């Protein structure tokens, strides 16, 4: 499972001209399920994401997590993160989980996030979304938890 997280001062998702999710300062997270992913990978990735230290402490070092700063988390499904771009000029999405599994894992991830974090907003699986954000830093990290083989 993959999460591309960006530290933001604000972020929002619009579907059909309606804002369906928005946060202030926190993390905007593009989330992708890959073939072979299970709730085990989702749990591990969520734990890492909520504990990942990307916010400054009093000394200006990245020593605080989104949990520590009570920041928002905006979760946006993004299957293209699993693209295989090794050959040619057209990406292959074979590494991505099938849509039914991906939706199930996204929903699971969101449910777990809501239980573990104070402020969670989401995009809409399968929708044409317009995502807006103000990247703070910029600070962007790729987190990945691969299934055990």
Swiss-Prot record:
Motif (Gly-cisPro motif, important for rejection of L-amino acids): 137-138
Catalyzed reactions per annotation: glycyl-tRNA(Ala) + H2O = tRNA(Ala) + glycine + H(+); a D-aminoacyl-tRNA + H2O = a tRNA + a D-alpha-amino acid + H(+)
Pfam families: Tyr_Deacylase
Annotated compartments: Cytoplasm
Predominant location category: cytoplasm
Keyword RNA-binding among record annotations: yes
Keywords for the protein's UniProt record, in alphabetical order: Cytoplasm, Hydrolase, RNA-binding, tRNA-binding
Domain of life, per lineage: Bacteria
GO molecular function: D-tyrosyl-tRNA(Tyr) deacylase activity; Gly-tRNA(Ala) deacylase activity; Ser(Gly)-tRNA(Ala) hydrolase activity; tRNA binding
EC top class named in words: hydrolase
EC annotation from Swiss-Prot or TrEMBL: 3.1.1.96
Gene Ontology CC terms: cytoplasm
InterPro entries in alphabetical order: Daa-tRNA_deacyls_DTD, DTD-like_sf
Alphabetical GO biological process terms: D-amino acid catabolic process
Subunit structure: Homodimer.
Similarity comment: family membership: Belongs to the DTD family.
HAMAP family: Deacylase_Dtd
PANTHER family (alphabetical): D-AMINOACYL-TRNA DEACYLASE 1 (PTHR10472:SF5), D-TYROSYL-TRNA TYR DEACYLASE (PTHR10472)
Functional note: An aminoacyl-tRNA editing enzyme that deacylates mischarged D-aminoacyl-tRNAs. Also deacylates mischarged glycyl-tRNA(Ala), protecting cells against glycine mischarging by AlaRS. Acts via tRNA-based rather than protein-based catalysis; rejects L-amino acids rather than detecting D-amino acids in the active site. By recycling D-aminoacyl-tRNA to D-amino acids and free tRNA molecules, this enzyme counteracts the toxicity associated with the formation of D-aminoacyl-tRNA entities in vivo and helps enforce protein L-homochirality.
Domain comment (free text): A Gly-cisPro motif from one monomer fits into the active site of the other monomer to allow specific chiral rejection of L-amino acids.
Protein name: D-aminoacyl-tRNA deacylase
Designated gene of the protein: dtd
